[in-house]
A protein has these predicted regions:
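Active-site activation/catalytic loop segments of kinase-like enzymes and analogous catalytic loops
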Residues: 234-270, 285-304
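Hydrophobic packing residues in well-ordered alpha-helices of helical domains and bundles
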Residues: 74, 131-134, 162, 166, ...
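ATP-binding pocket architecture of kinase catalytic cores
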Residues: 29-36, 40-164, 171-182
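All-alpha amphipathic helical-bundle segments outside canonical DNA-binding/catalytic cores
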Residues: 271-285
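ATP/Mg2+ or Mg2+-diphosphate-binding catalytic cores
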Residues: 251, 290-341
Length: 341
């Protein structure tokens, strides 16, 4: 995917297989910023279903075997993007090479968006009304009818998303190449302090400013659904807060009362189900999807089964995470014991 001399022909082959004609691909150039997948931007002209199209597109594909930081499925990501498109502000997915027959690796093509990365936008424009728009984005995502989502999305095997996530903490500790006692501690703490349940919904699992853009109208655009599952929607709120500790600002903390009030209004959740203490709980629980992937690939690297400098770099994130988990559990314990207001 990095060679601009061969990729236009491969993209042409994919579009041709989808029934497009009069195909012209130009301006192919790899993009930076992709965390787990290879990405490139290109210009395209083609005719499909009797309509002529011209625009900028993004190719998103798997890295070479043994170099992936996390393992995900382009076919499922494509299906999720198609299902959420009527409900969310996200770049439309257009074409899929599920087996890599044309591109050389499993890949999908999306429409390019001129929206700007969130953190640079905030540096230039300030926080503005992004906290409320974040609440509305999260609320819209978490109220998409589950029966409209792909059947391939993982559901809670135990019937309870919290039980599944707590079990993942335990399994990650067991499967790791080294002992991870803090993971066992976190699992026990999460089990002891469960909040009231809410209905399951789509969970993004990497819901952060890194996967959001701001468009020309100042609205949030959400991207990158490769880790999505069906689970407890509050996991996304906790993950957002956890990520913001490493990459501030925390838009939720700008005005938590207004954020939570708007989110509850959209979702219909009660104050008992969604409040600052519950978000602190999910700050810990909600990161395990990404944490387990990083820990697992770290084990594979230690065993000589995979190699990538990015893997070693991302293992350092686990050390930062451990400090955040301990701080969160200590703060919540104090609040539950009535030591703080």
């Amino acid at each position: 995917m990095q060679d601009p001399n061969v990729m236009p022909e491969k993209i042409t082959s994919l579009l041709d297989s989808e029934g497009a004609t009069d195909i012209d691909i130009s301006g192919y150039a790899p993009m930076t910023g992709g965390y787990s997948r290879l990405m490139a931007r290109f210009e395209a002209k083609f005719t499909i279903d009797g309509e002529q199209e011209e625009g900028t597109f993004v190719l998103r594909g798997d890295p070479p075997e043994g170099q992936a930081i996390i393992e995900t499925d382009r076919s499922q990501e494509y299906a999720v993007l198609k299902s959420v498109a009527p409900h969310l502000n996200t770049p439309p997915a257009r074409f899929l090479d599920s087996k890599g027959i044309h591109i050389g690796t499993p890949a999908l093509i999306l429409e390019f968006t001129e929206a700007e990365s969130t953190l640079p936008w905030i540096e230039k424009n300030g926080i503005s009304d992004l906290p409320l728009k974040l609440a509305e984005l999260a609320g819209a995502m978490h109220t998409i009818p589950v029966d409209q989502l792909p059947s391939s999305l993982a559901r809670p095997t135990s019937g309870d998303p919290l039980t599944d996530q707590i079990q993942m903490w335990k399994k990650t500790a067991i499967d790791h190449v080294e002992h991870l006692p803090i993971f066992r501690y976190v699992a026990a703490w999460l089990d002891k302090n469960r909040p009231p349940p809410v209905p399951v919904s789509l969970v993004h699992h990497d819901f952060s400013t890194a996967n959001m853009l701001v468009d020309g109208e100042g609205d949030l655009v959400v991207i990158d659904f490769e880790l999505a599952t069906i689970g407890d929607p509050r996991e996304d709120l906790g993950y957002f807060k956890a990520y913001a500790q490493a990459a501030p600002p925390d838009l939720i903390d700008e005005n938590p009362d207004d954020f939570l009030s708007r989110y509850r209004e959209i979702t219909g959740f009660s104050e008992e189900q969604v409040n600052p203490l519950v978000m602190t709980y999910f700050l810990v629980l909600g990161v395990i999807g990404v944490v387990s992937q990083i820990a697992n690939v770290g084990s594979a690297m230690a065993k000589g089964e995979t190699s990538s400098t990015n893997i070693a770099f991302n293992l350092d994130n686990l050390l930062f995470g451990q400090a955040a988990w301990m701080a969160a559990t200590d703060a919540l314990e104090a609040a539950l014991d009535g030591e703080v207001n």
